[in-house]
Amino acid sequence: MAGKTLDRVLYVEDEPDIREVARFALEYSGDYEVKICESGAEALSIVGTFKPDIILLDVMMPGMDGLATMEALRQREETADVPIVFMTAKVQSAEVSRYLALGAASVIPKPFDPRTLGATVKEIWEEHAG
């Protein structure tokens, strides 16, 4: 990924208020193109046309949860190597260790600070870009 920049963020979140705060924070902080999906199924349906540089993924969603969504994204050629970051209120050390062991690049606790979300996402992406 040498020379690649962070331009496109996919955020999968079922809560409308959280989606909008995150969208605003990311667009404001980095002028990123942010695509929002309400479910794992929706995310899987758009990754063929929207090629994200990083994926932010809620863990607890109805239907396909974040873990199942990550597993499905990893099986797709377009997203097999894209860093996936879980955003969740479940941040006990055992849970975080489990998410990382299953392949998450990082975990951002909810509630998150909108003022620092963009910088946090960029930092995580840079750690995994090289």
Question: Which role fits each region the language model picked out?
Answer:
Residues M1-L10, R115-G130:
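Non-catalytic signal-transmission and effector/linker regions of two-component phosphorelay proteins
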Residues E13:
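Conserved acidic carboxylate
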Residues P16-K35:
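Two-component/phosphorelay signaling modules centered on CheY-like receiver
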Residues R23, A68, V91-I108, A119-E123:
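Alpha4 helix (beta4-alpha4-beta5 surface) of REC/receiver domains from two-component response regulators
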Residues I36-S45, G66-A68:
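Helix N-cap/capping motif at the beta->alpha junctions
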Residues M61:
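Receiver (REC) domain active-site loop signature in two-component systems and cognate sites
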